[in-house]
Amino acid sequence: MISEEVFSSICGPPIAANTAISKDVGVYAHSLTPSWTVKSSFKKSSTPVHCLALSDSHVFAAQDQKAHVHVYSRLRGNQESLVPFQERIKCLALAGDVLVLGTVEGRLILWETCTGRQVTTPPCHVQAVSCIAVSPHHILSASEDSNVNVWSLAHLLESGQDVGLEPDRTLSNHRAAITDLVLGPSSNPETNLCVSASKDKTCILWNYLTGQVLRTLLFPTSPLCIALDPCARALFVSSEDGNLYLVDFFGDKPLLGSRSAELASIVVQVNSPLGVADEEAGSASCLSVSYDGTSVLTGHTKGKILKWNLVDNSHPTELANLNASVTNMIMAPLLRGKASSQTVTVVKPNQAQRQYTLTAQLEGNLSSNSRFDQMLNSKGFSPETIAEAIASLSAPSSGGSDDMDLKRQNDELREIIKEQQALQKATMERYAEAK
């Protein structure tokens, strides 16, 4: 049975003198289904909000008020290395094998974990980078200066382009610091979606490739953390007053698409919450949606992890109490993507390196070519492809039983026609005799 796994992190001192919870553990790996259990843990980490990233082989955790990133091996279950940087890290995200870090000085640092190559941008924001979101082709960095910068990942990683890097565009409709940023799964220029939350009590839906504002949502209090439904059909928002909101994009009154009745410039007021967390839980600092989109997990400042069941809309249930502020919750993918290599040990960044060396473990048999590779490298159609085509055209039809059934039906239809013709002939003869 496939098990959903969620990673959580904590930051700050213990809330209560609870001896049942280890004080050294900073990152937890929980099993969500079929039952909630702690599968593994990683020690000596204090990870603030937006400072946890996850790959198939490693866990990356930036440390609070420090310029360090702790790298943990998921395969070995221990801390692999401590990676220092020149500036304090405010947030991070993982784009494939590239770890993207935002600093308090407003810069972006890109670290290729398989090569050690490091790319640093100029100060792209006036204030600290508060959160980062990545897609297969783009990086979005949000800041306390209320702006969101859209970067091309390929352009940032282009060799010899460490100086003079600038974002492709800037999204600047917010009037206060941005608290969270999420991307939809689509990379199509017409259907890509980005949602930013801000202390100005709004969430803005963007087409981040064009910079178009698709919709502005206004809440009673400031949204602290947001998450999209797995299919980007709805937005989950947790605000500073403990309320959890569900905004349906394609409901009775669609907010997006051609069926939307209102102009994109019209602000939508969101007043009715899906539920309210108990006061002793505190406000939510992180939010995660299950793989099937039927439940929501929230991590709170008082150490509790709550599960909201969307099927029956019941009161949230407490899954765990980590005895410290829960700052990050990341759902691990159910199925690993097919990759030809795996990072067993990360290569620490080195700005002075002159050689580009890739360090990875190859997986599978790389010597055997696929059918596509064989067709691509052959001149015209390969002999095997031509032979298969000739065989498929010359082979006798496999539907012999179907042909016999059709022949039988045709014979029955001919008999019926003959009977009708004989009946018509007899009727006409009687009609002629009657005249």
Task: Give the label of every model feature segment.
Residues 252-285, 303, 311-435:
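Terminal intrinsically disordered, low-complexity extensions flanking WD-repeat/beta-propeller proteins
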Residues 11, 63-65, 102-105, 142-147, ...:
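Conserved strand-to-loop turn within each blade of WD40 beta-propeller repeats
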Residues 28-31, 69-73, 108-112, 148-152, ...:
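WD40-repeat beta-propellers
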Residues 42-49, 83-89, 122-129, 171-178, ...:
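WD40/WD-repeat beta-propeller blade N-cap
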Residues 37-40, 78-81, 117-120, 159, ...:
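A structural motif specific to WD40 beta-propellers
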Residues 2, 51-58, 92-98, 102, ...:
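Loop/turn segments within WD40 beta-propeller blades
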Residues 1-32, 59-60, 99:
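An edge-strand/N-cap motif at the start of beta-rich repeat modules
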Residues 27-43, 76, 164-166, 268-274:
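A short helix->beta-strand "capping" segment at the edge of beta-propeller domains
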